[in-house]
Amino acid sequence: MKLTDYVKQVSLEDFGRAFIHHVQWNRRLRSTGGRFFPKDGHLDFNPKVYQKLGMEVFRKIVRHELCHYHLYFQGKGYQHKDRDFKELLKAVDGLRFVPSLPNSNSKPLKLYRCQSCQQRYQRKRRIDTKRYRCGLCRGKLLLINQPED
């Protein structure tokens, strides 16, 4: 997909206005779908959102960033808190927040249980069961599930 052409097309179809600045992918974006830079007018987009969430969600994120873009160059309120932004975003059916991405590097939790009081503990890291005990009754801990590494 040619990103610049796609953003120009969305801008014309959904806003009736031309997009004349630069667009690029930014792999460093983690928790956001895109960014608008008022200083030079360019847009950055997160390629992981397009790859993992699909074209429909990505189009709504493009609309969101184009709301910032067009409102800024019209001299209206372009920030999330501004009424102009909220109204335009609603009118073009853009996303307010990007859905959370499936995290590929998250490790499965290890589950421990106290042998005395049956208290359960979830941990990301392994616990040395010879050294550590239950926080409630001081009973021995037992590893219930061992995820495949």
From Swiss-Prot:
| Cellular component terms (Gene Ontology) | cytoplasm
Query: Quick one: which residues bind Zn(2+)?
Result: H64, H68
User: Cofactor: bound how, per the entry note?
Assistant: Binds 1 zinc ion.
Q: Which cofactor does it need?
A: Zn(2+)
Sorted alphabetically, the keyword list is:
Cytoplasm, Metal-binding, Zinc
Q: Name one GO molecular function term.
A: zinc ion binding
Q: Where is the active site?
A: E65
Domain (SprT-like): residue spans on this chain:
5-143
Origin, by domain of life? Answer: Bacteria
Protein location? Cytoplasm
| GO biological-process terms attached to the record | response to stress
Pfam families hit by this protein: SprT-like, Zn_ribbon_SprT
Q: Which family does it belong to?
A: Belongs to the SprT family.
Checking HAMAP family in the record gives: SprT_like (MF_00745)
Protein name, per record: Protein SprT-like
Which source organism does the UniProt entry give? Answer: Streptococcus pneumoniae (strain ATCC BAA-255 / R6)
